[in-house]
Curated annotation (Swiss-Prot):
<dbReference type="InterPro" id="IPR018198">
    <property type="entry name" value="ATP_PRibTrfase_CS"/>
</dbReference>
<dbReference type="InterPro" id="IPR024893">
    <property type="entry name" value="ATP_PRibTrfase_HisG_short"/>
</dbReference>
<dbReference type="GO" id="GO:0005737">
    <property type="term" value="C:cytoplasm"/>
</dbReference>
<keyword id="KW-0547">Nucleotide-binding</keyword>
<keyword id="KW-0368">Histidine biosynthesis</keyword>
<keyword id="KW-0963">Cytoplasm</keyword>
<dbReference type="GO" id="GO:0000105">
    <property type="term" value="P:L-histidine biosynthetic process"/>
</dbReference>
<dbReference type="Pfam" id="PF01634">
    <property type="entry name" value="HisG"/>
</dbReference>
<keyword id="KW-0067">ATP-binding</keyword>
<keyword id="KW-0808">Transferase</keyword>
<dbReference type="InterPro" id="IPR001348">
    <property type="entry name" value="ATP_PRibTrfase_HisG"/>
</dbReference>
<comment type="subunit">
    <text>Heteromultimer composed of HisG and HisZ subunits.</text>
</comment>
<keyword id="KW-0328">Glycosyltransferase</keyword>
<comment type="function">
    <text>Catalyzes the condensation of ATP and 5-phosphoribose 1-diphosphate to form N'-(5'-phosphoribosyl)-ATP (PR-ATP). Has a crucial role in the pathway because the rate of histidine biosynthesis seems to be controlled primarily by regulation of HisG enzymatic activity.</text>
</comment>
<dbReference type="GO" id="GO:0003879">
    <property type="term" value="F:ATP phosphoribosyltransferase activity"/>
</dbReference>
<comment type="similarity">
    <text>Belongs to the ATP phosphoribosyltransferase family. Short subfamily.</text>
</comment>
<comment type="pathway">
    <text>Amino-acid biosynthesis; L-histidine biosynthesis; L-histidine from 5-phospho-alpha-D-ribose 1-diphosphate: step 1/9.</text>
</comment>
């Protein structure tokens, strides 16, 4: 049965508040949504819009599988997962960067000195692709949190991680060696939904593009 609601997967956490600010400017509904709510689905019948609250790493899966028509998620997650979705708009917020960071004690090493070393990361695909592109053989150690601990405990020689202010690196006596890529928040779209709900989706895309380039929706 065809569902005429536009379903949007929202990333919980730091991206939620700026996303709701964008929706407010676009005159999209958002009453009652906050990161502390236990509700996972918010439905607005008058506007025919439905939001689902997801962990950021789950957003591309919901969109790819058609459980959501659209999703709001960081570029880092998109690149790491390589899901079969359309990337529609760079929303220009939630900026951070992927970096290779090493202990302060070896801050003067060069990129080629990383050959045959070990890198801890939550993003093994991005890390492996980067080192391979540089012609380096690096052992990737996947962790799920506290990446900065790995060099301190001798588990890894370096880390590959997302950085915004750099404060966490400094607190753990790590320094940025090289930037791999920038990451900002993106609007992604299910491939089938883009065709079947084009009349609902395309105006939203165009208005988001206007906002992201400094215009008004």
């Amino acid at each position: 049965m065809y569902d005429d609601y536009l379903t949007i997967a929202l990333s919980k956490g730091t991206l939620l508040e700026p996303t709701l600010e964008v929706f407010k400017k676009l005159k999209l509904p958002g009453e009652g949504i906050n990161d502390k709510s236990r509700s996972m689905v918010f439905t607005y019948d008058n506007e025919r819009v439905k939001y689902i609250m997801c962990r950021p790493t789950d957003v591309p899966t919901y969109v790819e599988q058609g459980a959501a028509d659209l999703g709001i998620v960081g570029k880092d997650v998109i690149v790491e997962q390589a899901r079969d979705v359309f990337e529609m708009v760079d929303l220009q917020y939630g900026y951070c960067r992927f970096v290779v960071a090493v202990p302060e004690a070896i801050k003067n090493i060069t990129l080629k000195d990383l050959n045959y070393k070990r890198a801890a990361t939550k993003f093994p695909v991005i890390a492996e692709n980067f080192f391979r592109s540089q012609g380096l053989q690096v052992e990737i150690i996947k962790l799920h949190g506290n990446i900065e601990l790995a060099p301190l405990m001798g588990l890894a020689d370096m880390i590959v991680d997302l950085v915004s202010t750099g404060r966490t690196l400094k607190e753990n006596r790590l320094v940025e060696l090289i930037k791999i890529m920038d990451s900002t928040t993106r609007l992604i779209c299910n491939r089938v939904s883009y065709r079947t709900k084009h009349q609902q989706i395309q105006p939203l895309i165009e208005n988001m593009q206007k906002l992201s380039t400094g215009g008004s929706a």
